[in-house]
Amino acid sequence: MGAASGQRGQGPPSPLLLLWLSLLLLLLPPSPAPALDPGLQPGNFSADEIGAHLFAESYNSSAEQVIFQSTVASWAYDTNMTEENARLQEEAELIWQEFAEVWGKKAKELFDAIRQNFTDSKLRRVIETIRTLGPANLPLARRQQYNSLQNNMNRIYSTSKVCLPNKTATCWSLEPELTNILASSRSYAKLLFAWESWHDVVGIPLKPLYQDFTALSNEAYKQDGFSDTGAYWRSAYDSPSFEETLEHLYHQLEPLYLNLHAYVRRALHRRYGDKYINLRGPIPAHLLGDMWAQSWDNIYDMVVPFPNKPNLDVTNTMVQKGWNVTHMFRVAEEFFTSMGLSPMPPEFWAESMLEKPTDGREVVCHASAWDFFNRKDFRIKQCTRITMEQLSTVHHEMGHVQYYLQYKDLTVPLRRGANPGFHEAIGDVLALSVSTPAHLHKIGLLDRVANDLESDINYLLKMALEKIAFLPFGYLVDQWRWGVFSGHTPPSRYNFDWWYFRTKYQGICPPVVRNETHFDAGAKFHIPSGTPYIRYFVSFILQFQFHQALCKEAGHQGPLHQCDIYQSTQAGAKLQRVLQAGYSRPWQEVLKEMVGSDTLDAQALLEYFQPVIRWLQEQNQRNGEVLGWPEYQWRPPLPDNYPEGIDLVTDETEAERFVEEYDRTARVLWNEYAEANWQYNTNITLEASKILLQKNKKVANHTLKYGTLAKKFDVSNFQNYTIKRIIKKVQNMDRAVLPPKELEEYNQILMDMETTYSIANVCYLNGTCLHLEPDLTNVMATSRKYEELLWVWKSWRDKVGRAILPLFPKYVELSNKIAHLNGYADGGDSWRSSYESKSLEQDLEQLYQELQPLYLNLHAYVRRSLHRHYGSQHINLDGPIPAHLLGNMWAQTWSNIYDLVAPFPSAPNLDATEAMIKQGWTPRRIFKEADDFFTSLGLLPVSEEFWNKSMLEKPGDGREVVCHASAWDFYNGKDFRIKQCTSVNMEDLVIAHHEMGHIQYFMQYKDLPVTFREGANPGFHEAIGDVLALSVSTPKHLHSLNLLSSEGGGYEHDINFLMKMALDKIAFIPFSYLIDQWRWRVFDGSITKENYNQEWWSLRLKYQGLCPPVPRSQDDFDPGSKFHVPANVPYIRYFVSFIIQFQFHEALCRAAGHTGPLHKCDIYQSKEAGKLLADTMKMGYSKPWPEAMKLITGQPNMSASAMMNYFKPLTEWLVTENRRHGETLGWPEYNWTPNTARSEGPFPESGRVNFLGMYLEPQQARVGQWVLLFLGVSLLVATLGLTHRLFSIRQHGHSLHRPHRGPQFGSEVELRHS
C-alpha cells in the first residue's frame, strides 16, 4: 500500500521525553514565513468559463514549479531527517500553502457562483480542486503550527526505536527489526514486547499532538464548506451514499472474514494453547504476523491447510537465487512493460531510495511512490527487504508510478486517481498475477506448478490471509478517525473507541492492559501522517473487479485465482485507458468502462475466493468452531518472566532441527562413552580410567554445548509436546555445568569412590583376602556365627567407608553446585525432579506409612527367630536387631536367613539353589531361562550380540571388575549387555530376570529419541524385571523349571512362600526409603559432615529397627559401604519400584486371566500380559509416568494396595503369631546394643583366633589370655562404657525427632545412562 507499512518507537528517549520535546518545539515562536515569488501569483481573469480555462492553464504551469520544489524538500526530509531538512521542508510547505491560498481564494472569488454551470466537466473538476484550500485556509501562525505538528508526528513515528529491557545499546527500528520480529518470531513474550513497546513509544507522545492537529485540520476544512476533515476525505468519492455503500460491502464480506478468523484462531490455539487463545474470544493483536494485525500472511506457516504441498512463500528461493532489491524492481517493471505499459524513466533508477541507507541517516521507511510533477521525475522510497511480501509491495508501489506516468500530461489538479482507491488498486491488480504459482514458476521462483485442489486451497488461504484479513482493518481505521473528526470520539475516549472498533470488526484484543494514557491508533503510520485509509478498503474491492475484467480481456479461461495477465497487451491497453483518465472523469464512469458496472461490488472478490470459502466453512463446521467472539471481554494473561525472557527462541521448527541434531550427535557420543565405561567396569586399570575420563569429558562438553543451546528456547507454549519435553530435559546439563577444573575434580572424585568400592577386599593375617563378590556376600548369606559375621561386617566398613569419607564432603559440595547451576535448590531437589511431582515426598511418606505395620510385624517375628538362634546376649526382644545378622551386608533383604525363620520348617524347601547346582545350571543358563520368560510373553529376544558381549560371571583371569549387577544400553539400537558376577543360586536367578527387564526396556524404546530412552520414572525401569521375577519365584513356575519337586498349594506351603518373598520385598521397604532420606538431608545441609554416621544410624534405627553390632564413630562412614552412595546412584527408585511392581503384577495377572490369590499368579506365556507390558515400555520417558501407570494399571497413582493384597495371607498369619507370643512391635528399648565382648573362637579358612584384634595361633592366644586377664577385664568394662555413652549421644540426637521426607524404589540395579 502506497502508505501501508510502519515504523517503531524511540530507543533511549522515553515517550514522555519525546512528548515534552515536541510540545516545546510547538511553543517556540514561529519563524518568518518565506514569501511566494510574485511571478507565481494569479493574474486577472474573467469570471466566465473562458476565463476559467485561462485560469486553469496559468495555474498549471505555476503549480508544477511550486509542487516540484515542495516535493523535493519533502523527499530530502523523508530520506534524511535532520533539523535543517525539517526547516527547509516546512518553508517549502508554507510556500505551497501560500500558493494554494492565493489561487484558491481567486478561484472562489471568480468562479464559485458559476462553476456548476460549466459545460466542460473536466474544467469544473479542476476549479473545484483548486478552490479547496485545506490547511491553507489557516492564518499563518496556525498554519505554521499545523505544519510543525505534522512534521513532529512524522518524526516521532519514523525515528522512534524500541530498546531491549536494561539494554539501551540494543535498540530496534520499525524497519526492518520490529517488522521482522512480528513477521517471523513465534515467541509470545518477544512478540508482546515488540508490540507493547512500539505502541507505547510512538502512541503516548503522539496523543496531545494529534488532538491539536485534529482541531486545526477541522478548522481548515470547515472554511472549504465541509463539516469536518472526515467529510472532506469522503468527498473524494463523490457519492452521497458512500458510507452506506461501504457498510453494505463490509457485511457482504463479513461471513468470509468470520470463517477465516475462526480457522486462524484454532491454528493459533494449537500453537499457543488455552492460556493465550480463547476459542470463543478475540485474538491477541500481536500474534498475527504484523504490527497492526492488518494482514496475516506472515503466519501462513502456522495455518497452512496442506503442509506437504509445495511451499508458496518463495522468500527462501529469492534469497538462494541471489535476488537483490534492484532485481525485484526490474522484475516489477518488466511485468508492466510486458503488457505494453511504460518503463520507468532514468530519473526513477537514479533518484529512488529502494533500500534503507546504511550511512546512519534517519529515514521514513514507510513505502511510498512520489510524483514530482515535472512529468519526468518519479521515485519510490522503500526500505525493501528480500521477501515475497515485499515483492508484492514493490509491484504495488510501481503501480502508483505507472499511474503517474500515464496521466502525467493532464493538468495538475487531474493528476490523481479516479478516486483514492483506484490509485491503491493498480499495483495490487498486477500483484494478484505475480503471486500465482504459474507466474512464480515463470520467473524462476517455483520449481513446478501443482494443479490440484489441495495446492489451490493452500494458495487461496495464503491470499486470504493478505486480502480478507485486511478488510475489517481497512474499514475501521477511518471509521474511528471520522468519529474523532466529528467529535463523536473525544480525546478522553481515543483509545477506548479504537479498541472498540478493533474488537467489533477484527475480533482482536490488546494483549496487555491499555488505557487513555495510550494512543494505540498513533502506532499506525497513516494516523500521524494524516493519510486517509478508507482508500485501501476501496482498493481491495476494486482490484478484484479490475482483475476479473483484465483476465477476461486477456482471454483467461478457468478459475479467477489462476489468472496471470503477464504479457497480455490487450489487458495492458484496457488498463492504460483507466490510468490515462486520471481524475478527469467521475470514477463511476471510468469503472464502468473498465468492468461494465459503475458500482463497487464484492462479487469478483467472492468468486476469486469461492473454493477456500467453501473449504473454511467445512473445516469450521467439522471442528465445531464458534464464528465470532461472543466472549469479547476476554483478555490474555501476561507471560511469566516478562519482559526479561523475550530473547528466548520459540520457533518450534528451529527447535525440531535442534532436537534432531542433538539426538544424532548424542547417540554417537553416548555410545563411545558407554564402551569406555564398559571397558573400565570390566577391567579396572589406570589406562581404562584415563580413557573413561576423556570420554566423560567429551560427553560433558556435548551436554554443556547443547544444554546451553537448549536454554535459549522458551518451550512454555510449544504445542509439540515431544519437542517441548526433550528440550526441557536437555536444558538440565547435570555435571556439565561445572567449570572445567571442578568438573575434572568431580569426575575424579566419583571415579575414586567407585574404584575404592569396587576393588576393596578384606584380608586375614595369613594373607587370604576376600572380595565383596562373591566372598563376603556368601559369608553374610550362609554363616550363622555371630563373630564371623561381625568380623566381615566391620572389616568391610573399615576398609571401604573410611576410605571414601575424605572424598564425600567435596562430592556433596560439587553435587549441590551442579544442582544450583541447573536451577535446583540442592542435589536432592535435582534427583527428585525426575519424578515430575510436587507432592513426591508426601506421596512416598504415605506409602511408607501404609506398609509400616506389615514391616513391624515381620521385624518382630524375625527378631524372635534370631533370639532363638543367638540368645538374649545378642538379641533383645524389645530392641533393634544387630545389623549383621540378617543375611546381607546391608540388611536390605533378609531372604538368606529364611532357614532361621521359616514358619513351617517341615514344609517343602522353596529355595531352588540346591536343585540348580545339582542340575548343573550355569550363569548362561540362568539368563537363557530369563530370556525365555520374556519371549513367552511375546516380547523381544535378546540378540546374539548380547550373548557375545555381556559379562555374565566374574572373570577368572584376575581382572578387577565392578561386580555390582548392571544392565547397559549402548545407544545404537542393537547393543545391549549385562554385567553381573552371577552365582548359581536362586537369588541370582531373580536378579537375572531383573537385569533382563532392563534389557527388555532398552529394546522396546530403542527407536525413541535418546532423551526418552529411560523409564517413565527411574522406578519403572527397576520394576519391569522384578515383575517377571514375581512370577518366576512362584512354586508353580519353579516346578515348571524342574527346580522344585511340586507346585505346593497347601496353607503352610503358601505361608512359607510368602515369608520368603516378604524377607525380600517387605524387609527392603524401609532400607530403600531411608538411604535417600539421608542423602537428601546431606544435600540440604541438615546433616553435616560432622554427623554423617550418627545420622545414618539414627535413620536405620528409626526405619529399619537396626543397630550397629559394634560402636561406630564419626571416623566411620557406613553409608559409603553401600555401592549406590559412592557410585552416585539415587536410591529412591528402588522404593518406588518395590511399590509399583506389585501394581504392575496385579494388572498383568488380570490381563493374563489369572484367578485366585495374587501371590500364586504366573504370567508366563501370556501374550496379553506381554502386550500390555510392551506398550508401557515403548513409551520410555516420552510421557509423564502417571500416563504410563494409567496405561498398564488403568489409573495414574502409586498405591501400596496391590502389595498389601499380595501379602495379605502372611500379614494375617504374622499378626496372629506375634500376638500369640506377645511380641513387641517396634523397638522401644532403642538404646540397647548387643554384647560387644567377643568369644575368642577360630575363624574358618585361617585356623587362627582373634585376640584383642590380633589373629594368633590358638596356643599363643591361650597364653595371652592368662597373662593379660586383668587387662582384658578392664578393657571389657571400658568398652562397654564407651559403647553405652556413644549410643546415648546417638539416640538422643535431634534427628530422631526430625520429620522425614522422601521417595525410593525397587530391586536394585545400577543403570548406566550418560
UniProtKB/Swiss-Prot annotation:
Q: Which residues form the signal peptide?
A: 1-35
| Biological process per Gene Ontology, one example term | angiotensin maturation
Phosphoserine PTM positions read: S1307
Residues on Extracellular side:
36-1265
Which cofactors is this protein said to need? Zn(2+); chloride
Glycosylation site positions: N44, N60, N80, N117, N166, N324, N515, N683, N701, N720, N766, N948, N1197
What residues does chloride 2 bind to? R797, W1096, R1100
**One Gene Ontology CC term in the entry:** extracellular region
Active-site positions on this chain: E397 (proton acceptor 1), H526 (proton donor 1), E995 (proton acceptor 2), H1124 (proton donor 2)
- What transmembrane ranges does the database entry give? 1266-1282
Q: What is its main location?
A: membrane
Membrane topology type, per the record? Answer: Single-pass type I membrane protein
> Which keywords does this chain's UniProt record carry?
Calmodulin-binding, Carboxypeptidase, Cell membrane, Cytoplasm, Disulfide bond, Glycoprotein, Hydrolase, Membrane, Metal-binding, Metalloprotease, Phosphoprotein, Protease, Repeat, Secreted, Signal, Transmembrane, Transmembrane helix, Zinc
* Region of interest called Juxtamembrane stalk, as start-end residue ranges on this chain: 1221-1262
Functionally, this protein is described as follows: Dipeptidyl carboxypeptidase that removes dipeptides from the C-terminus of a variety of circulating hormones, such as angiotensin I, bradykinin or enkephalins, thereby playing a key role in the regulation of blood pressure, electrolyte homeostasis or synaptic plasticity. Composed of two similar catalytic domains, each possessing a functional active site, with different selectivity for substrates.
Name of the featured protein: Angiotensin-converting enzyme
**Taxonomic placement:** Eukaryota, Metazoa, Chordata, Craniata, Vertebrata
